[in-house]
Curated annotation (Swiss-Prot):
Single GO term (MF): structural constituent of ribosome
Recorded name of the encoding gene: rplK
UniProt key word rRNA-binding: yes
Protein's UniProt keywords contain Metal-binding: no
PTMs per UniProt: One or more lysine residues are methylated.
UniProt xrefs under NCBIfam families: L11_bact (TIGR01632)
Disulfide bonds: none
HAMAP family, sorted: Ribosomal_uL11 (MF_00736)
Keyword annotations: Methylation, Ribonucleoprotein, Ribosomal protein, RNA-binding, rRNA-binding
Protein name, per record: Large ribosomal subunit protein uL11
Length: 149
């Protein structure tokens, strides 16, 4: 018989930097899950990734207080900022104040868009790479990035 699911917790945790402080501790603690067990497992799985990369994670909590977690690809905005050479960190560079109208904050090529789309395909709600590129192009425009050929 399968375990009964009591809920899901969605978090964005920096790779290799999971610790029991907020937001992880309170989110898992209120479900009665072992916080340190998650932190150790997550850090072990993300050890080979670049430190600080934001990783979306979905934690499934079961009635017996056990859990499983699924990691997704980093957000599209992370890939776009990295490809455009914008500042990454705790307070990332904000995009354009008037996307599509005013000055652009950076440039990104079609090849870079395609590369990002191929990485994000499993997490996106689309069937073809072309539609994934179109979605990511829209995100780039909304951030104030200019797409060049």
């Amino acid at each position: 018989m399968a375990k009964k699911i009591t809920g899901y917790v969605k978090l964005q945790v920096p790779a290799g930097a999971a610790n029991p402080s907020p937001p992880i501790g309170p989110a898992l603690g209120q479900r009665g899950l072992n916080i340190m067990e998650f932190c150790k497992a997550f850090n072990a799985k993300t050890a080979q990734m670049e430190k600080g990369t934001p990783i979306p994670v979905i934690i499934t909590a079961y009635q017996d207080r056990s859990f499983t977690f699924e990691m997704k690809q980093p957000p599209v905005t992370f890939f776009l900022k990295k490809a455009a050479g914008l500042k990454l960190g705790k307070k990332p560079a904000s995009g354009s104040k008037t996307p599509g109208k005013g000055p652009t904050v950076g440039k990104i090529s079609e090849a870079q868009l395609r590369e990002i789309a191929e990485k994000k395909m499993p997490d996106l709600n689309c069937d073809t790479v072309e539609s994934a590129v179109a979605m990511i192009r829209g995100s780039a425009r909304a951030m104030g990035l200019e797409v060049v050929a």
